[in-house]
Amino acid sequence: MMLTRTVTAVALLVTTAVPALRADGNAPGFARGADVSWITQMESEGRKFYTPGDDRQEMECMQLLRDHCGVNSIRLRVWVNPKDGWNNIDDVVLKARRAENLGLRTMIDFHFSDTWADPGHQEMPEAWKNLSLDELTTAVGNHVTETLNALKNVGVTPEWVQVGNETTPGMMLPVGSVDNPGQLTRLNNAGYDAVKSVFPEAKVIVHLDGGNHQWAYDRMFDILENNGGKYDMIGMSIYPYWAEQQGETGGWTKVADDCIANINHLRQKYHKPVMVCEIGMPYDQGELCKQLITKMMGAEVEGIFYWEPQAPNGYNDGYNLGCFDNDAPTVALDAFKTK
């Protein structure tokens, strides 16, 4: 998730045969996910969660999402040295162990920052700012290895690991900018190799924002392909709200159609599966959000993760794209319920 978007324009088209790489949206293998990284912070503030309907029952959030919303996977972000401790390694391990105990699958999302990393913010961790490229590459690998070993030690085996979050302009700027393709690829590969050293079967994801912006995906994945970049899966974010804020017209259906066209293009060009790592709409548009998720579940994707669904309207200085109202789920995630 992010607060700003940047717009550039590049377009490349290549079409080739593509293998079958997806699970059906209603099949058990399809990831019906939620990023709940705020959950421990919210609990520390005394927030509670309730089952939908008139007979409200208090329930732990991950169990609520599993039992009442059809969620089978959890996504958790990792920050390097956050000032308040949330999203550090210990916090991530705590949440991941809870998910594991509920039988939920796990995605780990490395931001490689002390705070939010997104298209408008790809800030180097403070402790890494004066490192050489060689030292930075080592730091990336060590951070990934330390985090994943901590998870392994408590019995958590992530199914997917993101090397960077919404890295449309690159990561750990300016060193890992898309304007420095060799350096960006080297940092990416350091993360990839570290993941595989701990969890060889984990799928490594490179994740960009704006799933309807084909040019950005062509730029990033051409960089990786041309420089020996390693990745197993393409990740995208889908937020019609942000598209509208940028002046794009056509509403959520246009965004969804453009995302689906891009998904088909990416699978054909790069022969990689695609995951919707983030999706969301305003909390008071639950029915429209349900339609968006349902439409995207019919696309050639491996799964869909709603970003912080449990967040109340206005949480954390104004986030309004959750899908809970009065601390209970809206109908948005009904799309995840298996038929």
Q: In which residue ranges do the predicted regions lie?
A:
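Boundary at the C-terminal end of the N-terminal hydrophobic targeting segment
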Residues: 20-25
